[in-house]
Amino acid sequence: MLLTIDDVLTQEELAIARSMLARSAWVSGLVTAGTQAAQVKNNQQVQENDPQIVNLRRLVLGALNRNALFFTATLPEKIVPPFFNRYSGETNHYGFHVDNAMRLLPDGSGYVRTDVSATLFLSDPQEYDGGELVINDTFGQHGVKLQAGSMVIYPSSSIHQVTPVTRGERLACFMFIQSMVRNPDQRRLLYEMDMALLQLRQNIGETPAVVSLTGTYHNLLRQWADS
């Protein structure tokens, strides 16, 4: 399931994030690339030991924690601490690749299974040319270029790329989520059911039928969630 989520960050949070990024130390994006990705990755990211990264991660994770749509779409069990990247000048693209199935946590404490990948845009589209996130799925190819503060989520199994940035600078945050429900089809059905229940509550209230369907949703989640 490919889904965009608007206004994950407030304008104030976005300004704070960009201010911190302006003071950050940048290194080659190859530091987090797998064997295949290293052949096509040409960008920069914030250095792991940079003093800004703790506050940047806290800001993003705090925004995700209050976002109900992010929760219902991903059903997060674990989130790899977010990374921050930059595309500009000579380090301006990331060719087609697939994300590693398992990601080592930055502190080396263990691995997280990548079920869902997410990109949070930190630059507005008019600030740069190119830089589309292009995602392939069973329905074709999708180009995504969102307003700053908005996010796209998609299955980590998807082949995707970032096209060359030919003008300006593209700042973004990317992360990987291990979902409570690893099967993407089951996760999509639960999301669609939750959205339908939300609409029913708005239209007719908490009727006995809505309560019953809510119970069915939670029973399915109970059945499909990893034990």
From Swiss-Prot:
Cofactor note: Binds 1 Fe(2+) ion per subunit.
Keyword presence, Oxidoreductase: yes
This enzyme's EC code(s): 1.14.11.-
Domain Fe2OG dioxygenase: 78-179
Gene3D superfamilies: q2cbj1_9rhob like domain (2.60.120.620), Rabenosyn, Rab binding domain (4.10.860.20)
Cofactor(s) it depends on: Fe(2+); L-ascorbate
A GO molecular-function descriptor: 2-oxoglutarate-dependent dioxygenase activity
Residues that, per the record, bind Fe cation: H97, D99, H160
Protein name: PKHD-type hydroxylase NE2125
